[in-house]
Amino acid sequence: MENNFIVNENEKRVLKQIFNNSNISRTQISKNLELNKATISNILNNLKHKSLVNEVGEGNSTKSGGRKPILLEINQKYGYYISMDLTYDSVELMYNYFDATILKQDSYELNDKNVSSILQILKSNINVSEKYDTLYGLLGISISIHGIVDDEQNIINLPFHKNEKRTFTDELKSFTNVPVVIENEANLSALYEKSLYINSNINNLITLSIHKGIGAGIIINKKLYRGSNGEAGEIGKTLVLESINNNDNKYYKIEDICSQDALIQKINNRLGVTLTFTELIQYYNEGNSIVAHEIKQFINKMTVLIHNLNTQFNPDAIYINCPLINELPNILNEIKEQFSCFSQGSPIQLHLTTNVKQATLLGGTLAIMQKTLNINNIQMNIK
């Protein structure tokens, strides 16, 4: 990393103001940070010399007249980040400029579940020397996994892939020579939701990620809560008593009976066919009774799970990241109706994740931005 990427504490404070306030003036920065204008001017000169910020024209003058204020913004073309989401059957890549604006996205299918194959895909398709019309090129990489990561950035559990005793972070650092951060996908979705301007007044929130498994990203007092070993939010492992195929009641992990993939598998078993996700939506919209019944059972179980989450953490809001609910928003309406019957206390906000398709990747972008800059609570306005 170039030396001009290193900033001192006052420079970090000013840089954060510019990240979090689009087209802000030095006068407003001075007021926000309670630093005199001369100090702010010196800091901004340093940041401009390092190519981290740009002047973008003039704002409106005050009612009393005088010089129009110079407005500032983050230099988008300083460099770029790559965020990766390792899904069950693909590797999703998002490239973002220094200000988090999306540069491009790529998707690669997995032919097998071996980590060695995944690393080979990355090494074959990431051109480390490519700068994409930026000054310094690649600045850092984030990795999202559907699994558990401890506080030392070690993968504790990777249920859908074969780890082969390979380490993503070490091998990618060696290949790219940039910082790498790895995190659970639900946690990254929660970081993204917390970072949005529209949620800036929310202190406590949960994102509920429902895909092949079920996980929760937990924000408490504006900070990600990971637990003692990174296992907080593994609510898909919650045990429920269930009778399957008319057998005696047994305890099952809730994600084994009502994750999105478990729901689709159950419907396929009952219909005796193999529906794609798109076909499932079509069957539901056409009023297929079996599909409607199983989705109703899914709604019932999800409502109970959300109610239990609410009683345990009492967040300001819960955001649901689920492609099925994104395609069939009436499911969320029914969950809300049932939830209101269960919950006797103060109402909470219950929403779809702001960006179901990109929340995890954008959360990864935020995580690596904050790591490389050593600045917390950067806000973004990308929906």
Curated annotation (Swiss-Prot):
Organism field: Staphylococcus xylosus
Residue ranges for the DNA-binding region feature of this UniProt entry: 26-45
Cited function: Transcriptional repressor of xylose-utilizing enzymes.
Protein's UniProt keywords contain DNA-binding: yes
Origin organism lineage: Bacteria, Bacillati, Bacillota, Bacilli, Bacillales
Lineage: superkingdom: Bacteria
GO annotation (BP), single: D-xylose metabolic process
Gene name for this UniProt entry: xylR
Keywords in alphabetical order: Carbohydrate metabolism, DNA-binding, Repressor, Transcription, Transcription regulation, Xylose metabolism
PROSITE patterns in UniProt: ROK (PS01125)
UniProt name for this protein: Xylose repressor
Gene Ontology molecular functions: DNA binding
Family recorded in the similarity comment: Belongs to the ROK (NagC/XylR) family.
Keyword Transcription regulation: yes
